[in-house]
Amino acid sequence: MSDDKTSPMGLFKKYLTNRRIFKNREVLRHNYRPQILPHRKPQIDEIASILAPALTNETPSNILIYGKTGTGKTASVRYVGTELENASALAGTKCKIVHLNCEVIDTQYRVLAQIANGLDNADEHPSDSTRSHIPMTGWPTDQVYMELKNQLESSGGVMVIILDEIDKLVKKSGDDTLYNLTRINSDLKFAKVSIIGISNDLRFTDFLDPRVLSSLSEEEIVFPPYNAPQLCDILQQRAEMAFVEGALDETVIPLCAALAAQEHGDARRALDLLRVSGELADRENASGVAEKHVRMAQEKIETDSMVECISTLPTQSKAVLYAMLILEQMGKRIFTSGEVTVVYREIARIIDLDVLTHRRITDLISELNMLGVINTRVISRGRYGRTKEMWFDAATSKIEEVVTRDPRLDDERLKKLDVNRLRAMFR
Ligand SMILES: Nc1ncnc2c1ncn2[C@@H]1O[C@H](COP(=O)(O)OP(=O)(O)OP(=O)(O)O)[C@@H](O)[C@H]1O
C-alpha cells in the first residue's frame, strides 16, 4: 500500500514496468487490419479479378461469399476494397466502397440510408446543394430509395456495396432490400452498383426469392476453414509484431493453432487464444508465455463465452437450467426431460412464472444443447418410447452463479424448494 502511494504511478506502476511480453498487443485485437493475409491469396485474387472491371467504369458481377466464422472473409474483402480504391485513384476513375455490418444495420431503411450517407461526402461535393442527408429514421422508404438513386447518379462511377453478415439482414427484414438493390442498376444512367454479400450461414439463401438469389450470386466464393499449419503461419506473422522477441515458448503458437483448428479452423479464435495467453502471462509477471498460459487462456475463453451466453438467456430458459442444477445437486449426473419438467414446474410455481408445456420445455432443452451449455442424447426405452437424456460437461458452479444473477431466480422462496420431496418422487 505505502509503495503504491509513494511511487508517482501508484497502483499502476507494476503494469507499466513489465514490458517482457508485449511489444504491441493491439495487433492481436479484432479491429486490427493486417496488411498480409497468409493463405488467402486465391480468394483475394478471385475477388480482385471480379471487381477489376470497376476500374474501367464497367459494372462488376455481384458476389456471394460464404465460409465459417473467422475464415478471413471480412479481412480479405476489406483488403481488396482498399486496394481497389487506391488503384482507381491512380487510374483516375471513380470507385467507392461502402462496408455495412448487417448485424447492426438490419432494416431496409437503414441500409439504404447508410449507403446514401456513405456517398454523401461533403468534401467531394462542396457546391452540391441538391444532396440531402437522410436521417436514420423518419422518411418513407420510397423517398430514401429515390434519394439514394439521386445521390448515386450525381456521384457517378462505380459503387461496391459490401453487406457483411447479410443473413442477419434477410432474417430480420426479408429480401426486399436485396430485391431493390439488385435491380437498382436498371434505374441508373451515370452510376453503377455492385454488391458483395458475406455470410457464415448458407441457409439464409432458402429465404431469398429465386430472382434475388440468382442476381446476388452471379459469382460465389467459398472460404474454407484454416487447418493447424495455416493458423500457425497467421499467428506467427502477428506474433512478430505483437510480442517481444523470445517471449513466446516455442510450443505456444502450435498449441494455439491446434486448439483453434480442432474447433472450426477459426483465425479469430486462434488470435484470441494467443492474446489472452499473453495477457495471463503478463498479469502474473512471468518472464514469457508458456504452454500452461495457453491452457489457462482456453479455459478462460470458454468460461467467458458460456457466461455471456447464459446471462443473455430469457428467464424461462434459466429456470429450465436451474431445474437441471437442482437435479445435479440431488446427486444425478444424467437426467431425463421428464425429470427436468417436474423440477422446472415446481420452480415456476414457487416464483410465479408462467408454467410452460412439456413440449416447450423440450424446445428450450434443445436450444441449451445447441448453445453448448448442456449435452443431450435421445435413448429408446422400448415400449415406453424414446426420451431425451442430458448432462453437464463442465463444473456447474459458474453456471449456477450466472443463473442466479437473474433477479427472478435469486428468490428467497426458491431456498424453500423441497428437495427431499422431489428426491422421493424420482425414486
Ligand atoms: N489469413 C489471415 N491472415 C491474418 N489474419 C487473419 C487471416 N484470416 C483471418 N484473420 C484475422 O482473423 C480475424 C477474423 O477474420 P475475419 O473477421 O475476416 O473473419 P470472417 O470470416 O469475416 O468471420 P465472421 O464470419 O465471423 O465475420 C480477424 O482479426 C482477421 O484479421
Swiss-Prot record:
ATP binds at T71, G72, K73, T74, A75, Y226, R238. It holds the Pfam family Cdc6_C. The keyword Nucleotide-binding applies. SMART domains: AAA (SM00382), Cdc6_C (SM01074). One of its GO terms (molecular function) is ATP hydrolysis activity. The keyword Chaperone does not apply. Coiled coil: none annotated. Involved in regulation of DNA replication. This is ORC1-type DNA replication protein. The lineage of its organism: Archaea, Methanobacteriati, Methanobacteriota, Stenosarchaea group, Methanomicrobia. The gene is cdc6.
